[in-house]
Amino acid sequence: MRSILNMPVAALALALSPCTMAGDFDGSKQLICAPVEAAACASGEGCATGIPDDFGAPAFMRIDFLQKLVVGPKRASPIRSMDKTEHQLLLQGVELGHGWSMAIDAATGKMAVTMVDRHGAFVVFGACTPQ
């Protein structure tokens, strides 16, 4: 019973403590991200895999947390949602009729990105580094 009563106190202490996330991947520094692997999937058709260039993905993306943008060579996409946890940074937005999500590992900078619409999904894996 005593441990149950201490749970709210522990939760409050955790909520008020500073984030222990790696400083490079916590949203405090601009990042340059490079996609390395890609897959395009359509319902009932399976997935095609290849390098990101095969599917028209940019070679590099810059994440500007101050401006809340993911910037590529042709366009910039606003970051509509951002959530930090101990293990990852999650970003979300909408671009060209697709919903997108990006997850960046807080320790390594490895990333996974998805773009999805009613027809299928596009998945990219890669890595980010501080700019």
Regions found by a protein language model. Give the residues of each.
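Edge beta-strand at a domain terminus
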Residues: G46, I51, R118-Q131
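Bacterial N-terminal signal peptides that target proteins for export
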Residues: M1-V9
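Contiguous, well-ordered beta-strand patches that form the walls/edges
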Residues: I63-S101
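Short, solvent-exposed loop/hinge segments that bridge or flank secondary-structure elements
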Residues: G27-Q67
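Short, exposed beta-strand-loop hairpins at the edges of beta-sheets
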Residues: A103-I104, M111-F125
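N-terminal signal peptide c-region/cleavage motif recognized by signal peptidases
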Residues: S17-C19
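Hydrophobic/aromatic beta-strand elements that line small-molecule binding cavities or substrate pockets
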Residues: A59-M61, G99-A106, G126-T129
